[in-house]
Amino acid sequence: MARTKLYMRIVAQRVTHASVTIDGKVKSKIGLGMLVLLGIEEADNEEDIEWLCQKLTKLRIFSDENDAMNLDVNQVEGSFLVVSQFTLHALTKKGNRPSFIRAARPEQAIPLYEQFLKRLAEVSGREVQSGEFGTMMAVELLNDGPVTIIMDSKNRE
């Protein structure tokens, strides 16, 4: 049986503000910037992290003075809020209950998640806030546009 190809997956949303609340307390929040939902798959590695961090930092999804998406997160002095989300790797081909078998197990995913946060801060030079890995969170955001971009680390188009 052929294996479905899934890799580190990101959903990046341009936001005017976003926050993560855990047990009724705000853990982290940002103003203008990007909310990044990060799904880590079993085949992911440091190369995937590097490519995605470089891409996110240079992604021109913010409006310039002519309302054209022409500016990156640095040019608008924005921030990142990164939230781990294994459900981005849901397999829904069979039945009605999603399978998450391809999502990386916590012992592999946590170090990669932490490395992603560190590397994104290094590459971007911007503030990087985060959710809490493996915890039920309430994520609140005001999607600006809306602008929502999906990227897979092995599908580098």
Task: Map each language-model feature to its residues.
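Compact, glycine-rich, soluble single-domain proteins
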Residues: 25-77, 87-118, 123
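N-terminal amphipathic/basic-hydrophobic helices that include classical n-h-c signal peptides
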Residues: 1-7
